[in-house]
Amino acid sequence: MAQLDKQTYKSSWNPNVAEMVMSYDDDSAAGAAGVYSISTVIPAGAYILDVQVHTDTLWDNGTSATLIVGDSDDPNGFYDAVNAKATDLVANEVLSFYHLGGKEEAYVTDDNGVMTQYASTARTISAQMTTVGTTATAGVTRIIVIWAKPTDSVKSDFTAS
């Protein structure tokens, strides 16, 4: 039977958190219409536990501010067409695997949350905010990726019957 040292086991599932912050004044854009992009890399062998979208300040540009969150395989795999101006998230509201807000996409289901938790290779999680219309003077969105990577992995033993 496989054995795992208790001390190692106790510390093997510490969650890790990556925060991506999108702001209307990133990269001296000064709120101009366009696409704001951000990404973070989750290491190989990690399990994604949650991807959250927090609205600190609503985006106030002219026509629209639309957020997608996904990865390199599917840019909107987690969340699609999130209106950052007010209708989908108000200030201090959160989208998460447990509060989908009707914005879930291919990687997330109503029934059981995320479908693609584990990846054997490193995975780039990305977000894009597309703004249209007049220049924004406010807007801050935080995307939180919570993941865990075991420090030990125990494989089963097999004995033929």
For the regions a language model picked out, list residue spans one by one.
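Surface-exposed, low-hydrophobicity beta-strand/loop segments enriched in small/polar/acidic residues
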Residues: 2-161
